[in-house]
């Protein structure tokens, strides 16, 4: 298992059907293949890491520092640079291409993207406040947040107080999203459930940090298929037994009739 991640764009949502009788909502992500730009060793910084570049960028949009960095490299400039720490740096070389194959044996991933911006919102929408009373002395402040401070001491509003403000448009991470399937030919990955952001949102994927002992839908599907096969075998054996019993009954009846 590797700690290297990938970058993609959210295409949209769909639905996958399984023989168990379950339909699962999935998010489809188009993966951008990465390329190893630089290798960082313990001699340089005290740890082993790999710098991976994603996406195309015009040379005119590069900063002077990035132009100097890429002038020493044999690879073409990339729009995004991500650094991933690895255990065995000998497995990587500059210019190596990295794609969906790194998630071949991975069941769950962590996804980071920017949520949809919802503009300026009040506390009832933003934080699910109940608001003030509909009557009984309340006038023109039914949806307000109420008191935000105390009195002369401390004489200020503390930082982090839940108040009206800009809602959404923030970087959010979803943990342990199940990989339903991956299409290596078209660089598509299907994740269970939804992820933050609208269509064409930039998405960062990485191996799940929290390890969970949870059966995936595919594993559950296999278990159900095995159970169905066992039931089929049991039904076949029952039919065979019933046919044999009936045959023996007929034989006994025939013998009795002959004696009579």
Positions of predicted regions on the chain:
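Extended basic (Lys/Arg/His-rich) segments that typically form rRNA-contacting surfaces
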Residues: 1-260
């Amino acid at each position: 298992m590797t700690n290297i991640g990938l970058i993609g764009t959210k295409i949209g949502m769909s639905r996958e059907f399984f023989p168990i009788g379950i339909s699962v909502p999935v998010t489809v992500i188009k993966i951008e293949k990465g390329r190893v730009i630089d290798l960082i060793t313990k001699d340089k910084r005290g740890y082993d890491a790999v710098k991976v570049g994603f996406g195309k960028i015009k040379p005119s949009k590069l900063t002077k520092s990035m132009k100097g960095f890429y002038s020493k490299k044999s690879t073409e400039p990339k729009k995004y640079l991500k650094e991933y720490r690895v255990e065995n740096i000998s497995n990587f070389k500059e210019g190596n291409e990295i794609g969906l194959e790194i998630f071949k044996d991975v069941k769950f991933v962590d996804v980071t993207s920017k949520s949809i911006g919802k503009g300026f919102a009040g506390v009832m929408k933003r934080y699910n406040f109940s608001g003030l009373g509909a009557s009984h002395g309340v006038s023109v402040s039914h949806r307000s947040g109420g008191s935000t401070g105390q009195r002369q001491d401390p004489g200020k509003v503390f930082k982090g107080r839940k108040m009206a403000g800009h809602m959404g448009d923030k970087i959010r991470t979803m943990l342990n999203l199940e990989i339903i399937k991956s299409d290596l030919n078209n660089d598509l990955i299907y994740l269970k459930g939804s992820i933050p952001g609208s269509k064409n949102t930039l998405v960062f994927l990485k191996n799940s940090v929290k390890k969970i002992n949870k059966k995936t839908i595919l594993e559950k599907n296999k278990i159900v298929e095995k159970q169905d096969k066992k039931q089929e075998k049991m039904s076949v054996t029952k039919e065979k037994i019933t046919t044999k019993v009936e045959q023996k009954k007929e034989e006994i009846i025939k013998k009795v009739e002959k004696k009579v």
